[in-house]
UniProtKB/Swiss-Prot annotation:
Similarity comment text for this entry: Belongs to the bacterial ribosomal protein bL20 family.
Keyword Membrane: no
Gene3D superfamilies for the chain: 6.10.160.10, Ribosomal protein L20
Keyword rRNA-binding attributed: yes
GO molecular function term, any single one: rRNA binding
GO biological process, alphabetically ordered: ribosomal large subunit assembly; translation
Gene coding for it: rplT
InterPro entries: Ribosomal_bL20, RIBOSOMAL_L20_CS, Ribosomal_protein_bL20_C
Entry superkingdom: Bacteria
Entry GO CC: ribonucleoprotein complex; ribosome
Name of the featured protein: Large ribosomal subunit protein bL20
Amino acid sequence: MTRVKRGNVARKRRKKILKLAKGFRGSHSRLFRTANQQVMKALRNAYRDRRKRKRDFRRLWITRINAAARANGMSYSQLIGHMKKANIEINRKMLAQLAILDPQAFAKVVETASAAK
């Protein structure tokens, strides 16, 4: 059997991990073993949080819409129900933006939705 020298392959593999660990503190960016553990943990967290971010933003939008709706004398659930009946198809992200950046326009949406009870 021929001898296999893994020098280049192993070095490349380790350098790849250490490159990903750049910016980590202390030995987490210098020693291969701890760096490898931290990179795996970071990638796992990134994967999980890419999905969590979508849920977090939806919760934030709903909270903002609820606050603005209550300022206009209606709860969030009532507003969404009335909007469905009035065929107003504005998504939650746009509604939250309206509530913050243009309160008068948001008030108009609430008024239009409540008119179509």
